[in-house]
Amino acid sequence: MAASKTQGAVARMQEDRDGSCSTVGGVGYGDSKDCILEPLSLPESPGGTTTLEGSPSVPCIFCEEHFPVAEQDKLLKHMIIEHKIVIADVKLVADFQRYILYWRKRFTEQPITDFCSVIRINSTAPFEEQENYFLLCDVLPEDRILREELQKQRLREILEQQQQERNDTNFHGVCMFCNEEFLGNRSVILNHMAREHAFNIGLPDNIVNCNEFLCTLQKKLDNLQCLYCEKTFRDKNTLKDHMRKKQHRKINPKNREYDRFYVINYLELGKSWEEVQLEDDRELLDHQEDDWSDWEEHPASAVCLFCEKQAETIEKLYVHMEDAHEFDLLKIKSELGLNFYQQVKLVNFIRRQVHQCRCYGCHVKFKSKADLRTHMEETKHTSLLPDRKTWDQLEYYFPTYENDTLLCTLSDSESDLTAQEQNENVPIISEDTSKLYALKQSSILNQLLL
C-alpha cells in the first residue's frame, strides 16, 4: 500500500544509463551530482525551535558526512544520490535534526527494509540496470509517531517562549511610526501601535518571538517597503502617503513570512492558521443552509460632510459637495495652505458641528440635521468657515466618526497642486538696483582698464 501511494514521487528518478538525462520530480539533470531534488526553500529558523547543544551540524543517516543545520537541502541531496533514500514531506518535520538522529540510530538496529517502502526503478530494464530506492514516510506508524512527538515538543517550546515573553518586564522597544520608546512589557508597544496608529498585528497573547517580529517589520520600513503589498518607494513621505491612502498600514495575512510569529501555526502538524480556523468554522457551517456564493464585498464609501450622500471615490464626493453644497475642500486646502493634519482637524470640526446640528458660520443650533442643511444651503454658510483658531485645536485630531473614510483620502502632497498654484506660493524678490551705478563707478575694473 505504501509503495503504491508514493511510487509517483520517485518513479522517474532514474532512466537507462545510456547517457539520457535523469529526472527527479520532473526536474532533469545530466550529472547526478548537480541535480535539483525538489523545490528549494531558503533556510528558516522556526521560532522557539532549538538545536542540540554541541551539535551545530546534522549527520547523514548512513555515513559520517555532516552538513550545517541551515543546509538541509544539501543533506537531502546527498542521501538520495549516495544512499538512494528519500524522506517524504520534509517540510512537515518540526525538528529535522532530531528526526535524522533518531533514524540514524534505528537503521543501525534493523535493516532499512523494515522501515522504508522499496521502489524499484526501471523494472522493465535488464536486472543489472535496475536500482532500488527507499522511501521513508509517515505511512510507517513509527515515523508518524515520531513526527507527532517532535511537533508536540516544538509546541511546548513555543508556549514556554510565549509565557516567558508574557512575564518579561524588561522589554525595550521603539514605535516604528512615532519613535516613542517603551519599557516594561511587550504588550505596551503593541497596544500603543494599535490604538494610536491603527496598526494591529494581533493580540499580544497570540504572538511569539515578538522582538524578532518587530525587527522584521522595522527593517522593511527602513528599506522604504510597504508592509502589506511590499512595494518599495523612493522616500519615507511617499511610503507614508501610500500606506495611508491604500489603507496598507497592516500586514498581509497571506504572507507566510509572518506565520512563525503566531502561536496558532504551531498547533497542528502541517496545518496553517487558515486551515485550523476553517476546521473550527465547519461545525457551524454544517448547520447552515444559507448560500453565500453570490456575496460580494463592497468597497468602503466616503460620506458627505453635510448629508448622507456616499461615493465610492473621493473625486465623486468632492464633485457632489461642490455642486450640492457649494463647498470646495480642495480650494479651501489650497487657499489656506492646509497640511494633512490641519485638513484632519477641519474635517473633524465640521463633522462634529453637523452632528450637533450647529451651523459653524453663524453658531445657530437647529433641531435636526435636515433643518441645519436647509439653513446652510440658503444662507451659503457652508463656505463661511470660522477663524482658524476655532477649529485648529488639538481636540480635533480625534475623529468624530471612527470609520470616516474621508480622513484616509486626505493628502498633503505637492503633486496635488498644479504648477501654476505652486508658483503662486513662491515669493519673488526683485533685485535692488538703486546703488548699481555707484557700485559700477567704484569697481576696481575701472582702474585696471585705464
UniProtKB/Swiss-Prot annotation:
Subcellular locations according to the entry: Nucleus
Signal sequence segment: none
Annotated Gene Ontology cellular component terms: nucleus
GO MF annotations, alphabetized: RNA polymerase II cis-regulatory region sequence-specific DNA binding; zinc ion binding
Effect the entry attributes to changing L445F: In a breast cancer sample; somatic mutation
Subcellular location, principal: nucleus
Modified residues (N-acetylalanine): A2
Keywords for the protein's UniProt record, in alphabetical order: Acetylation, DNA-binding, Metal-binding, Nucleus, Repeat, Transcription, Transcription regulation, Zinc, Zinc-finger
Pfam families hit by this protein: zf-C2H2_2
InterPro entries (UniProt xref): ZN622/Rei1/Reh1_Znf-C2H2, ZNF277, Znf_C2H2_sf, Znf_C2H2_type
Source superkingdom: Eukaryota
Gene3D superfamilies the record matches: Classic Zinc Finger
C2H2-type ZnF: 224-248, 355-381
Induction: Down-regulated by oxidative stress.
GO BP annotations, alphabetical order: cellular response to hydrogen peroxide; regulation of cellular senescence
Self-association and partners: Interacts (via zinc-finger domains) with RPS2/40S ribosomal protein S2, perhaps as nascent RPS2 is synthesized during translation; the interaction is direct; the interaction is extra-ribosomal. Interaction with RPS2 competes with the binding of RPS2 to protein arginine methyltransferase PRMT3. Interacts with Polycomb group (PcG) complex protein BMI1. May be part of a complex including at least ZNF277, BMI1 and RNF2/RING2.
PANTHER family: ZINC FINGER PROTEIN 277
Record function comment: Probable transcription factor. Involved in modulation of cellular senescence; represses transcription of the tumor suppressor gene INK4A/ARF, perhaps acting via the Polycomb group (PcG) complex PRC1.
Family per record: Belongs to the ZNF277 family.
Protein name, entry field: Zinc finger protein 277
Lineage: Eukaryota, Metazoa, Chordata, Craniata, Vertebrata
Gene giving rise to this polypeptide: ZNF277
